[in-house]
């Protein structure tokens, strides 16, 4: 199993063990839209999609910090963003609103992910998920 760690020099704190079944792809523009940190080596690769780890519960992390609520003036309304739809748990989910940022709990740097309100596109049910940007972290032990 691979581990996601903080990518900042002098930190490298373990953030979470990665479950490959919970990795989703979102469009490339998600990093600029949500103002997420990008690991320099990953940013230079310029892939067309970005991998995120879906984490259902904050207690599933080994070590993560959470910011204050993100003012809507920073990110705006996402209801018209049809690009931010992903498949997870046999459902199609749409990101409705970003609530808070995820940061490294040891060095307080980031943001390395977002806590989002998402909506199931078929059942019309809403829930909160943690989306951890794998491009914002260093991945150890990946084959």
Curated annotation (Swiss-Prot):
Top-rank taxon? Eukaryota
- The signal sequence is none
**Residue intervals of the MSS4 domain:** 1-131
User: Does Transport appear among the keywords?
Assistant: yes
Choose one Gene Ontology CC annotation of this protein and give it.
cytosol
Q: Which residues form a coiled coil?
A: none
Which InterPro entries is this protein grouped with?
Mss4, Mss4-like_sf, Mss4/transl-control_tumour
Which key words are in the record? Answer: Guanine-nucleotide releasing factor, Metal-binding, Protein transport, Transport, Zinc
Supply the Pfam families for this chain.
Answer: Mss4
**SUPFAM superfamilies in alphabetical order:** Mss4-like (SSF51316)
* Similarity section: Belongs to the DSS4/MSS4 family.
Protein function: Guanine-nucleotide-releasing protein that acts on SEC4. Might play a general role in vesicular transport.
Q: What is this protein called?
A: Protein DSS4
Q: Which organism is it from?
A: Saccharomyces cerevisiae (strain ATCC 204508 / S288c) (Baker's yeast)
Taxonomy of the source species = Eukaryota, Fungi, Dikarya, Ascomycota, Saccharomycotina
């Amino acid at each position: 199993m691979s581990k996601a760690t903080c990518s900042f020099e002098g930190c490298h704190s373990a953030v979470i063990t990665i479950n490959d079944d919970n990795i989703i792809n979102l469009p490339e523009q998600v990093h600029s839209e949500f103002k997420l940190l990008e690991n320099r080596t990953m940013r230079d690769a310029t892939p067309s999609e970005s991998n995120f780890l879906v984490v259902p519960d904050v207690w599933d992390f080994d070590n993560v910090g959470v910011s204050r609520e993100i003012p809507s003036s920073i990110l705006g309304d996402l209801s018209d963003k049809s690009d931010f739809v992903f498949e997870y748990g046999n459902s199609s989910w749409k990101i409705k609103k970003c609530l808070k940022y995820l940061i490294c709990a040891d060095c307080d740097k980031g943001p390395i992910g977002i806590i989002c309100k998402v909506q199931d596109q078929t059942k019309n049910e809403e829930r909160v998920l943690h989306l951890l940007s794998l491009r914002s972290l260093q991945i150890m032990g990946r084959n």
